[in-house]
Curated annotation (Swiss-Prot):
Its EC number is 1.10.3.9. This is Photosystem II protein D1. It is a multi-pass membrane protein. Photosystem II (PSII) is a light-driven water:plastoquinone oxidoreductase that uses light energy to abstract electrons from H(2)O, generating O(2) and a proton gradient subsequently used for ATP formation. It consists of a core antenna complex that captures photons, and an electron transfer chain that converts photonic excitation into a charge separation. The D1/D2 (PsbA/PsbD) reaction center heterodimer binds P680, the primary electron donor of PSII as well as several subsequent electron acceptors. Residues 47-117, 157-196, 289-360 are lumenal. A quinone binds at residues 215, 264-265. It is an enzyme of class 1 (oxidoreductase). Belongs to the reaction center PufL/M/PsbA/D family. It comes from Thermostichus vulcanus. PSII is composed of 1 copy each of membrane proteins PsbA, PsbB, PsbC, PsbD, PsbE, PsbF, PsbH, PsbI, PsbJ, PsbK, PsbL, PsbM, PsbT, PsbX, PsbY, PsbZ, Psb30/Ycf12, peripheral proteins PsbO, CyanoQ (PsbQ), PsbU, PsbV and a large number of cofactors. It forms dimeric complexes. Pheophytin a binds at residues 126, 130, 147, 214. It catalyses: 2 a plastoquinone + 4 hnu + 2 H2O = 2 a plastoquinol + O2.
Amino acid sequence: MTTTLQRRESANLWERFCNWVTSTDNRLYVGWFGVIMIPTLLAATICFVIAFIAAPPVDIDGIREPVSGSLLYGNNIITGAVVPSSNAIGLHFYPIWEAASLDEWLYNGGPYQLIIFHFLLGASCYMGRQWELSYRLGMRPWICVAYSAPLASAFAVFLIYPIGQGSFSDGMPLGISGTFNFMIVFQAEHNILMHPFHQLGVAGVFGGALFCAMHGSLVTSSLIRETTETESANYGYKFGQEEETYNIVAAHGYFGRLIFQYASFNNSRSLHFFLAAWRVVGVWFAALGISTMAFNLNGFNFNHSVIDAKGNVINTWADIINRANLGMEVMHERNAHNFPLDLASAESAPVAMIAPSING
């Protein structure tokens, strides 16, 4: 009897590429989402760096008054930004080949669209890559669900809000002072501080920070000491050890006595779910609030809600906020508007009640 051993034909180039892309043995997992993520994020990053350093001023309001945003045009790290594309462009897709020249493309803020479109696609693929790696490793898929909260926020300020307002010039500038300007104008036009979804977002972010500090301090304070008093307690932990590194019973007992028993978790899994869900749900609501205000479903308006017996207004803090909003609104885009929109849209007071009779 003769046994024949035949070497398996080597995989072709495409199969080797597929195996490399989906391999979990790589130092950094690539994945099929990564095939899109890497070039798009690289394009967005390179364009952002170049534009932040050297882009010429952009006619953001479409009234031939360019706004400088780059370092070489007089800005610093705090005041610098990639200025959003011009209001003259509106919501039109404005790639380089749509402009008559590179100078025109830069003047109308073309780099802003290039950056945000590549960034949003790359960031979305990053979320897909999180799911893909979890799937390959047999993990549950909740990491990408948590990441969806900041991703939804990015979509809200860079895409949904400009769509609702009718122009990418209303998108958030890519810089520190530009972000502050975006926030101030947003408050002036939409009263975001009085929107319940934004309030839930504040509770999510600040509450998440509080719970993170509480959890970290409780765990650090209830470590099971494996070292001497002269050594750091951190040396008592070995990566991959089977034993618990802190005493959850002690932490539960401490916190239950500090507040009350049922304020403390006695289940580590439900505790960590709560730590993740609180912040994620809060930021989801904040992104949803931005997306609703994009279409002018604004925050609560309690102006002139308290009056005396004679009908005179008794000012509340809501009226003070309203005056601040009007002040901010008249200050922004000074040369693009004669009046803030709230004043311009009010009913006009008639000067003459009836038309004069003309004899002759």
